[in-house]
């Protein structure tokens, strides 16, 4: 994948997260600064989603740990266990929000 293809796909992920959070019932604040999207929950915990262009990855830093995702066969997948990006982010957000959170493309 070229660098421009990576950026187009990765930027679309950040935009999709923002749209999902705008529509979510959960009270999750978010702020974007360049390639970094910070989600802040009512309890003060945060999830950081950031783009890593040199590696063509998207990284998530959550209370449960750090996760790296790479675009494989049309989806962003965890480089360790193959979990799909939106499913993983929804799970981490649900854990930190203490209520169901669904983040979808």
From Swiss-Prot:
Disulphide-bridged cysteine pairs: none
CDD domains in the cross-refs: Frataxin
Pfam families, per the entry: Frataxin_Cyay
Gene3D superfamilies: Frataxin/CyaY (3.30.920.10)
Superkingdom as given in the UniProt entry: Bacteria
A Gene Ontology molecular function term of the record: ferric iron binding
GO CC term (a single one): cytosol
One record GO biological process: iron-sulfur cluster assembly
Keywords: Iron, Metal-binding
Function: Involved in iron-sulfur (Fe-S) cluster assembly. May act as a regulator of Fe-S biogenesis.
Family: Belongs to the frataxin family.
Name of the protein in question: Iron-sulfur cluster assembly protein CyaY
Species per Swiss-Prot/TrEMBL record: Paraburkholderia phymatum (strain DSM 17167 / CIP 108236 / LMG 21445 / STM815) (Burkholderia phymatum)
């Amino acid at each position: 994948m070229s660098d421009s293809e990576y950026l187009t796909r990765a930027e679309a992920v950040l935009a999709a997260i923002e749209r999902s959070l705008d529509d979510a019932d959960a009270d999750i604040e978010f702020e974007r600064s360049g390639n970094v999207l910070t989600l802040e929950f009512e309890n003060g915990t945060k999830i950081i989603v950031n783009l890593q262009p040199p590696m063509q990855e998207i990284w998530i830093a959550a209370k449960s740990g750090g996760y790296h995702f790479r675009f494989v066969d049309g989806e962003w997948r965890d480089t360790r266990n193959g979990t799909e990006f939106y499913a993983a982010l929804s799970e981490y957000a649900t854990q930190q929000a203490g209520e169901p959170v669904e983040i979808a493309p």
